[in-house]
Amino acid sequence: FVCHLPSRRGGALVSARYRSYCCTRLREQVDSLMAQGGEGTHCLLLGDFNGDPEEAPTIEALRSRPYTADMAVQDLPPESLLALLHRETRQEPPGSYCYQGVWSQLDQAHLTASLLQQQGHLHYVVGSAETVCRPFFTTQLIGGGAPVPWRTYGGNFYRGGYSDHFPIRLLLEYE
């Protein structure tokens, strides 16, 4: 699933219910596909969730939990959703989006536990999920600090940048 959930415009708390609704529908689709597909079925959700992985729409409505390397994934139901980019995994940059100097991981990657349990030929390469920050994606804010995404637009002005979000990526292997 490639996702772009509703914006935080108007306030994160006010708009959270719209993101929760979308996450509930996504969870229903994941459950349906996993129930129909049997062993070797996997789901991957990527995109702009317009919230951090630790926020209510992700934790409660999507029922995704942070994946850590010490997690006993073999004991999880295959349809369990796991967030790959969260507070415990963040390095540099500290998120995929920076607004008024505050970083957030709005761009997220979630996968079913089946992709970690080596069911079938396809699996996630553990530790490969990352927020991609290359020099040509960035600009320096006045006053210094860490480089931030080089926006395409600033208000109504075209700036010519790549995006206001850094991209994310992960590796899957097929054996």
Annotated model-derived regions:
Residues F1-S7:
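Active-site-proximal beta-strand elements of phosphoester/diester hydrolases
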Residues L5, D48-F49:
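Active-site metal-binding loops of divalent metal-dependent hydrolases
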Residues S7-A12, P53:
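Short, well-ordered, mixed-charge alpha-helical segments that flank or form enzyme active sites
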Residues L13-E39:
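A long, amphipathic alpha-helix that forms part
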Residues V2, L45-L46:
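Generic enzyme active-site microenvironment
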Residues S32-L44, N50-E175:
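Metal-dependent phosphoester-hydrolase catalytic domains
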